[in-house]
Design a protein with these regions (language model features):
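Generic structural motif
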Residues: 33-35, 51, 89, 95, ...
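Generic N-terminal leader/processing signal
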Residues: 10, 38, 69, 75, ...
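A detector of tandem-repeat and repeat-rich interaction/domain scaffolds
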Residues: 55-98
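Intrinsically disordered, low-complexity terminal regions
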Residues: 1-6, 97-177
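N-terminal, helix-rich and Lys/Arg-enriched segments in bacterial and organellar proteins
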Residues: 32-37, 66, 78, 120, ...
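Arginine residue identity/basic-tract feature
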Residues: 18, 29-34, 73-75, 107, ...
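Extended, small-residue-rich solenoid/repeat segments and analogous flexible loops
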Residues: 1-63, 67-69, 177
């Protein structure tokens, strides 16, 4: 099997909880050794702790500054992007799709959205975890039209576009098409 990526010498030290103790580990930037999907030979990807974190099969890839470590696995055609952290025993697989935005809202936290096993969208934001619809309701209840509510509502609309949930005809009607 042709390996599709290598670990580069570029690394970051991060802290993770292992066996009840906070430990520093290194995650290494990856570089593509062959072309696949939208990745070209030589493209730099995100960071993994070991080669066990990212499969050489399929079109799975870690983009940007995303980090995959511990026993986490990314495989099949799944993509992990941006500043996402996939860790613990997490599995991102098949055609999984994940989307997040950092430093947003009243807590300046990271809001993560991903396709779940039922093909719905799960949202995590601070201590909230629920569906995209439940998140929208919570945002309306807690923030209404204040600046944080506006940020979250834009993020929800962007997520709908990202996951292909937007109303296709809305844009056409507004543009007179």
């Amino acid at each position: 099997m042709n390996e599709k990526y290598e670990l580069t010498e570029e690394f970051k030290e991060i802290e993770t909880l292992r066996e009840g103790w906070l430990q520093k580990i290194k995650v290494y930037r990856i570089r593509a050794l062959r072309a696949f999907a939208d990745v070209k030979i030589g493209d730099l990807g995100g960071f993994v702790e070991t080669k066990q974190n990212l499969s050489n099969m399929g079109n799975a890839w870690v983009y940007g500054n995303a980090e995959v470590y511990d026993n986490a696995r990314v495989r099949d055609n799944a993509w992990v992007c941006g500043d996402a952290e996939v860790c613990g025993d997490a599995k991102v697989c098949d055609n999984a799709n994940i989307f997040w935005c950092s430093s947003i809202g009243s807590r300046h936290a990271t809001t993560t959205m991903f396709r779940n096993k039922d093909n719905g969208i799960t949202v995590t934001c601070g201590c909230f975890m629920g569906t995209l619809e439940e998140f929208a309701e919570r945002v309306e209840k807690e923030h209404g039209e204040n600046i944080f509510g506006k940020e979250y509502k834009l993020l929800i609309e962007l997520a709908k576009i990202h996951f292909g949930l937007q109303d296709e005809t809305k844009g056409e009607e507004e543009n007179g098409i």
